[in-house]
Amino acid sequence: MPRQFSLENTRNIGIMAHIDAGKTTTTERILFYTGRVHKIGETHEGSATMDWMEQEQERGITITSAATTAQWKGTRINIIDTPGHVDFTVEVERSLRVLDGAVAVFCAKGGVEPQSETVWRQADKYKVPRMAYVNKMDIMGADFFNCIKMMKERLQANPVPIQLPIGKEDNFQGIIDLIEMKAYYYMDDLGKVIEQRDIPEDMRELAEEYRTNLLENVAEYDEELMMKYLEGEEITEAEIKAALRKGTIAVKAIPVLCGSSYKNKGVQRLLDAIVDYMPSPVDIEAIKGVSVDGETEIERHASDDEPFSALAFKIMSDPYVGKLCFFRVYSGKLSSGSYVLNATKGKRERIGRLLMMHANHREEVDMVYAGDIAAAVGLKETTTGDTLCDEANPVILESMNFPEPVIHVAIEPKTKAGQEKMALALQKLAEEDPTFRTYTDQETGQTIIAGMGELHLEIIVDRLLREFKVEANVGNPQVAYKETIRKSVKSEGKYIRQSGGKGQYGHCWIEIEPKERGTGYEFVNKIVGGVIPKEYIPAVDAGIQSAMNNGVLAGYPVVDVKVTLYDGSYHEVDSSEMAFKVAASMAFKEGMKKADPVILEPIMKVVVTVPEDYMGDVIGDLNSRRGRIEGMEARAGAQVIHAYVPLAEMFGYATALRSRSQGRGVFSMEISHFEEVPKNIQEQIISGRAKNNSSDE
């Protein structure tokens, strides 16, 4: 199948916004006008095409970024819908990574809300060209000009309005196009009948002022235009558009449009602007990668003639075709049925079917080209962030970094029969989502799930029930403590049972010493002259390790100790591996009690970004959580606080930060190291553990 749209006529864009700015509704309207959906879906009716997971339709928020292909005026537009909730930042990160440009949707009333700041900073990180669409111009309190002001102040952006609204709230009737200097009025409900008129008299002056602002702005991106402007010559529409496109792609200007997606006003203009100002794959820098040995940097240009390279950015389980792998083609072309190399894993993969995705149906294609976003069926080894490439020309593209999970809870199926089903389901979900982990707790034997926040884990539990029919009980979030010692001791362990028949005899002397934090366990055998025969030495080591699984203070695993076996005795008949294992275990337990044992807790490295006004409050709160502030730095209208805080004190922090910063603060945390717990808290942990154990019995 030959290429339908040239690379120049391809746009890969994301639609990003705060929850409730009307992002999904805007995407729905785009699909309606580009002819892909016959009946418009409404989010609040729960029928929106892009929100295809059941929980999304119930909660009215977008969780998984669905990729959709649409066409407008001879251009193919691939749209990635991204979620706006802070627990799903990984979805936003991974979609920004494969886009060429983004449309930021703002609510005309709320303006730049906290999540918009977060997403904006993520887009800054990847240098993604953006345009802005001020939505909901028809609602009470809508204020286009305040929204522009907030973009300057909160995002340190350079917004360039190319439209002005005519009227607002109930009286929102249409827009003034500042490039054509004409007014457009919407005459019907579906926004298909539009009347062009002259700019109304009462808005003439304002339009002239914003037109001047627009010309001054675009003149900066084109020297010829600058000369024309300074000499007062006429500047054509085509010249303005070309210069603004240049500024947008260089991430220096943000074209701003307005409308009301729900009332079908302004969406076709938005589509025109996507074609006019958003980059094609050819406009952005060639993607960089490295050779498989990591030695040489390799570039791949957006061209069908270069060797094939693509990045897998999302894995999904599909009820009809199994595992779907979404990928962005950066160079070359790929046909279904062919073999590719997964360079990240060093594995060969066969591409089964190739699908172009509409939000809820799919179209099978036999070939995809540079710049396309598609999904493949049949990939066994590939996970999020992997590079797929031509076997003869391997390359590893820059992958995505995913944060470590910050919260974990125990989970168990409601029925014994559900155990295996649950394990399989959790494994599938972990394949789809790199920030979700599942493992078994060695001490309690419980299954633990870990993720980016409470909503994240709630949705996982919800999906277990809906998609995999597994009912599960979930515990409270827990901290994984450890135990260690502070001084060296010598200790004896004797296990002797000799009362008729085969006896038991094991006897050893060990020295236990503290080691540096994070260096683990070390066993040294210093037995000379065979006082303990060689074959029993591994049993002594095993006995010590089994005793280390449960420390003497509160039963947490023991870490960072060195144990030296230096003396003992044995009995020719009664000694056995079992006897030495028990003796060593007894020696360790007795010795640890005398070695000044302490509990260690995980310390998190916490980074909080808040607007300056809330800084004092946030720092005070971190201090009250036993936090150590390590430093601060100013960043685009906000302060970034670096601190170390015990994990035990961080539960419920997302909610606390939200209320202390009126929802404008964001934070990330990852494990840094383990540290001794203060004495008073150690006592609380020990008594809490004792209570739990007695209630379990």
From Swiss-Prot:
Record's signal peptide: none
An example Gene Ontology molecular-function term: GTP binding
Subcellular location: Cytoplasm
Keywords (A to Z) from UniProt: Cytoplasm, Elongation factor, GTP-binding, Nucleotide-binding, Protein biosynthesis
Gene Ontology biological process terms in this record: ribosome disassembly
CDD domains assigned: EF-G, EFG_III, EFG_mtEFG1_IV, EFG_mtEFG_C, EFG_mtEFG_II
Gene Ontology CC terms: cytoplasm
Keyword Cell inner membrane: no
Residues of the tr-type G domain: 8-282
Entry-linked Gene3D superfamilies: 3.30.230.10, 3.30.70.240, Elongation Factor G (Translational Gtpase), domain 3, P-loop containing nucleotide triphosphate hydrolases, Translation factors
Residues engaged in binding GTP: 17-24, 81-85, 135-138
Family indicated by similarity: Belongs to the TRAFAC class translation factor GTPase superfamily. Classic translation factor GTPase family. EF-G/EF-2 subfamily.
Biological role stated in the UniProt entry: Catalyzes the GTP-dependent ribosomal translocation step during translation elongation. During this step, the ribosome changes from the pre-translocational (PRE) to the post-translocational (POST) state as the newly formed A-site-bound peptidyl-tRNA and P-site-bound deacylated tRNA move to the P and E sites, respectively. Catalyzes the coordinated movement of the two tRNA molecules, the mRNA and conformational changes in the ribosome.
Full protein name: Elongation factor G
Species this chain originates from: Acetivibrio thermocellus (strain ATCC 27405 / DSM 1237 / JCM 9322 / NBRC 103400 / NCIMB 10682 / NRRL B-4536 / VPI 7372) (Clostridium thermocellum)
Lineage of origin: Bacteria, Bacillati, Bacillota, Clostridia, Eubacteriales
This protein's encoding gene: fusA
